[in-house]
């Protein structure tokens, strides 16, 4: 058979029962009406297409597909054809058989981050219905196994869009490299009502017990976020009473809790009225809303289950603590007892005091909910309900129950504070580049200015850790950078815990308040001081909310190593699905940068596309920064050029032409090693680079060394030198390892608080623990980039290594040849299904969407090949769509012998294009009294394969 017939019909003109014997049919009387000439993307959730929800883009990127009629990997056939081509013959008892490289095929399938969760229907004729905006494509079930959707966000000429390589956008979003950074701030808790109780003239006076004194305020004055009452309070001149208050953000959730509380009270405190799972969900919602509404989802299952058990336990009337709480009289109330029991359950789950910065939303939600009723929770538990932290939870936190903690961490992206409201916020100043020579290099020098504090490595603590290192090797679970730093320790200080109202109602600030903390090892100095809100809350995250605050683009954020001092927000906002919406102003800010036009196809000042402007600029800028810093870590000497000067850190423009060709992070990683160690300037293709990085990360021991030997033989020679370090330059190679193990768009760390060893090129060279995913869950490049900026000069590199340096080499060789830190489990349904989500969102920011469906037809004779049948809308010309889809067959393009591209407009009219061995005609067909159109596809001299040929190809 060399002809293939595709009916194009309307049920009004001909029943499908007369056409259901055809493998493929196009029904044109079911469509989604366009709005203003664009597809109405808002209709996708109610249509039988793919499972993309009608949520904000950030919620959608964390969405777990719910309706699962099957999933499809669009490039599965491309992968299996390549595996078929590369089969090798092997002899066995049955003779010669061809063996498929199943390991490669599994990797290639798993590596594809474009899985489509389908929403399809099966009709009474055993056909699978795939809906497009302009029609429905009906396929017989035997022919449906390779059908997939192809969505393409249309390009806006005014923006000079280029929507190729949207995979790169997905990579940036999953590696925290498409995010805006904004400084951290604190303000008075919105769950507290602070009421003035007395005043004093100055801080040397004490508040008089039993009497009230008024100087500038009146009795009952409430302390807000500005004005004289706030000024007097922040100056520690007002004694206050703390009452609970319900903030507007969580009023609905607190109402739900109060409903449960009232039912519990009315049922005589019957535990069956307490549904722990329901409580836990409400408390989690509170915890998210009050800290970061767009917080990355965490795996709370184990902790949440433990919390639910504790809730059940505390609400049993025979529980001893339940009995004690109900024995207390005085100012105790049943409402207070309800929230006290929740707070105690949360404390027992945490096995210690719960703070607002607790990483688990359900626990911090328990604290916040209790604050709304009790005021300062632990102070009230002790004073009113006679409950204290258990001794087994440690003695350090029990004295804190005498204090009242009135400040809470703010997320400036989310806070509703008004312009002019007072806050306390961090200022974060990164060091400026400085001039140096090849002989001197750029090392960490601990120094501070007048009136500055200093955070550096504590020699005694470091020596203690080093002794443990010598005895037991690298302990990735217990070695922590924060354990070896001096005070004020930038990795442990927390203003929320360090500022409080003391036992005498005096406002106590920490010693570091309003002082610069200098930390050369983090290339920065920081200060927390008073400030105020500068702008109103906006949907667009590119809004510097604080006077003298800081906000940075993703390309600038690499320099900010200390995660607790800022928040991140994806620089996409708004709805996932929309007919049209505005994009973030951050892209216009990028377009104003001096290097924007050299890294993109734009001239300065034009309106830019978030992808061809934002994605490409961000990736290329970051790539230049990474390459330029790693170039300085080259172990080689600069013979004859020792006294040449250069600025550091600074971008080396020699890498620009290579960066412009890169399409994937893996190419960047491989190029670092190829350029510095292998002396190659040729860029590896993205598929090869991704495979190399995968193999390095997922092998260990001798197998990992074999991969390195094949991919980067000269680098391996330097690695082998770690077993017997001779000179300081031999240590440089250690700081290249994190690039191989910590950066990829589809990996997860085994644990987000484990530490890897890196060299800190200080005046004394040290091996320090760098926690992956630590410092507020920063991961990827941000977790280690700060430390690769330091590099020894030639004078240091020539020095002989001492016994300590030799130990560094041995420890790191053992660790990095065996570590499996990058082999954690990813959340496959969430992570792998987001490429189409991003495509649909980009479509709403640019010129709308073009949609199509791809069907594969096998050819059996005279030469085995495939023909692609594409059915789509008229937003793209059929020949352009053909070229776009064929180009996605990276491995097996030579097997595509023909393409037929059918375009259907909103009125059901057709436009068809064929290429290769295929020819087409549009004909009229009559069956009895019914009529329809058919697209007659001919392949002169060729024979189509049977239905199961595709099944065989997909199971090579």
UniProtKB/Swiss-Prot annotation:
Its main location: virion. One of its GO terms (biological process) is virion attachment to host cell. One of its GO terms (cellular component) is viral inner capsid. Pfam families: Orbi_VP2. It comes from the Viruses. The VP2 protein is one of the two proteins (with VP5) which constitute the virus particle outer capsid. It is the major target of the host immunogenic response. Responsible for viral attachment to target host cell, probably by binding to sialic acid. This attachment induces virion internalization predominantly through clathrin-dependent endocytosis. Belongs to the orbivirus VP2 family. This is Outer capsid protein VP2. It comes from Bluetongue virus 10 (isolate USA) (BTV 10).
């Amino acid at each position: 058979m060399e002809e293939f017939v595709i009916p194009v019909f309307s049920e009004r003109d001909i029943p499908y029962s007369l056409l259901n014997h055809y493998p493929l049919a196009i029904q044109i009387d079911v469509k989604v009406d366009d709005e203003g000439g664009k597809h109405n993307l808002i209709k996708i959730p109610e249509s039988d297409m793919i499972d993309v929800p009608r949520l904000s883009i950030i919620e959608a990127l964390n969405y777990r597909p719910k309706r699962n009629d099957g999933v499809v990997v669009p490039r599965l056939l491309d992968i299996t054809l390549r595996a078929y081509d590369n089969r090798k013959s092997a002899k066995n008892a049955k003779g010669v058989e061809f063996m498929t490289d199943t390991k490669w095929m599994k990797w290639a399938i798993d590596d594809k981050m474009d899985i489509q969760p389908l929403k399809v229907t099966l009709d009474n004729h055993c056909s699978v219905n795939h809906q497009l905006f302009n029609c429905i494509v009906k396929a017989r079930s035997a022919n449906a196994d390779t059908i997939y959707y192809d969505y393409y966000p249309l390009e806006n000429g005014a923006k000079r869009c280029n929507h190729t390589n949207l995979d790169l956008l997905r990579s940036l979003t999953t590696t925290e490299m498409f995010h805006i950074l904004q400084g951290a701030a604190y303000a008075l808790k919105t769950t507290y009502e602070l009421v003035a109780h007395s005043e004093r003239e100055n801080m040397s006076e004490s508040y008089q017990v039993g009497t009230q004194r008024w100087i500038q305020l009146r009795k009952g004055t409430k302390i807000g976020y500005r004005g004289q009452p706030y000024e007097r309070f922040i100056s520690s001149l007002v004694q206050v009473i703390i009452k609970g208050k319900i903030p507007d953000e969580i009023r609905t959730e607190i109402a739900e809790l109060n409903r449960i509380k009232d039912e519990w009270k009315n049922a005589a405190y019957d535990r069956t009225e307490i549904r722990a799972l329901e409580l836990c969900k409400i408390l989690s919602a509170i915890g998210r809303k009050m800290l970061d509404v767009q917080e990355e989802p965490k795996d709370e299952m184990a902790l949440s289950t433990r919390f639910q058990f504790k809730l059940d336990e505390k609400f049993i009337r025979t529980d001893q603590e339940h009995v004690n709480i109900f024995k207390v009289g005085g100012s105790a109330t049943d409402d207070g007892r309800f929230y006290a029991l929740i707070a105690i359950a949360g404390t027992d789950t945490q096995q210690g005091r719960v703070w607002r910065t607790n990483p688990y939303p359900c626990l911090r939600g328990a604290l916040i909910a209790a604050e709304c009723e009790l005021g300062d929770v632990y102070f009230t538990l002790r004073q009113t309900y006679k409950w204290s932290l258990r001794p087994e939870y440690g003695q350090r936190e029990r004295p804190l129950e005498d204090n009242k903690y009135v400040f809470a961490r703010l997320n400036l992206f989310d806070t509703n504070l008004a312009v002019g409201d007072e806050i306390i916020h961090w200022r974060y100043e990164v060091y400026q580049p400085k001039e140096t020579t090849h002989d001197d290099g750029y090392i960490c020098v601990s120094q501070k200015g007048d009136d500055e504090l200093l955070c550096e490595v504590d020699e005694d603590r470091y020596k203690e850790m080093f002794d443990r290192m010598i005895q037991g090797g690298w302990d990735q679970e217990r070695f922590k950078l924060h354990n070896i730093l001096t005070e004020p320790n930038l990795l442990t200080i927390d203003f929320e815990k360090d500022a409080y109202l003391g036992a005498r109602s005096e406002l106590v600030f920490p010693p570091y308040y309003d002082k610069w903390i200098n930390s050369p090892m983090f290339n920065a100095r920081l200060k927390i001081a008073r400030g105020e809100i500068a702008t109103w809350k906006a949907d667009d995250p590119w809004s510097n909310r604080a006077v003298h605050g800081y906000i940075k683009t993703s390309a600038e954020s690499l320099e900010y190593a200390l995660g607790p001092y800022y928040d991140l927000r994806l620089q996409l906002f708004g709805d996932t699905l929309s007919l049209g919406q505005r994009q973030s102003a951050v892209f216009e800010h990028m377009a104003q940068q001096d290097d924007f036009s050299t890294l993109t196809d734009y001239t300065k000042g034009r309106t830019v596309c978030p992808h061809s402007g934002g994605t490409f600029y961000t990736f290329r800028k970051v790539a230049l920064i990474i390459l330029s810093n790693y170039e300085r870590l080259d172990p080689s000497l600069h013979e004859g050029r020792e006294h040449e000067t250069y600025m550091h850190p600074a971008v080396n423009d020699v890498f620009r032409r290579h960066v412009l060709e890169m399409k994937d992070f893996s190419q960047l990683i491989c190029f670092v090693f190829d350029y510095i160690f292998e002396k190659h300037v040729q860029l590896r293709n993205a598929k090869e680079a991704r495979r190399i990085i995968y193999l390095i990360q997922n092998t260990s021991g001798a197998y990992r060394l074999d991969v390195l030997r094949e991919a980067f033989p000269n680098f391996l020679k330097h690695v082998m030198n770690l077993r017997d370090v001779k000179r300081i330059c031999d240590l440089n190679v250690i700081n290249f390892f994190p690039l191989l193990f910590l950066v990829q768009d589809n990996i997860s760390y085994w644990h987000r608080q484990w530490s890897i060893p890196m060299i800190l090129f200080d005046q004394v060279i040290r091996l320090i623990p760098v926690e992956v995913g630590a410092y507020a869950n920063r991961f990827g490049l941000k977790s280690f980039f700060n430390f690769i900026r330091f590099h020894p000069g030639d004078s240091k590199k020539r020095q002989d290594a001492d016994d300590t340096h030799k130990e560094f080499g041995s420890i790191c060789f053992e660790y990095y040849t065996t570590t499996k830190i990058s082999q954690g489990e990813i959340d496959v349904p969430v992570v792998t299904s987001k490429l189409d989500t991003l495509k649909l969102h980009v479509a709403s920011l640019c010129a709308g969407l073009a949609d199509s469906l791809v069907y594969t037809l096998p050819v059996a004779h005279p030469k085995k090949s495939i023909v692609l049948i594409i059915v789509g809308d008229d937003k793209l010309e059929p020949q352009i769509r053909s070229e776009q889809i064929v180009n996605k067959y990276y491995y097996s393009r030579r097997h595509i012998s023909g393409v037929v591209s059918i375009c259907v407009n909103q009125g059901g009219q057709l436009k068809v294009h064929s290429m290769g061995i295929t020819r087409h005609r549009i004909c009229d067909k009559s069956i009895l009294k019914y009529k329809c159109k058919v697209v007659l596809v001919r392949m002169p001299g060729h024979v189509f394969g049977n239905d199961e040929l595709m099944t065989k190809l997909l199971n090579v």
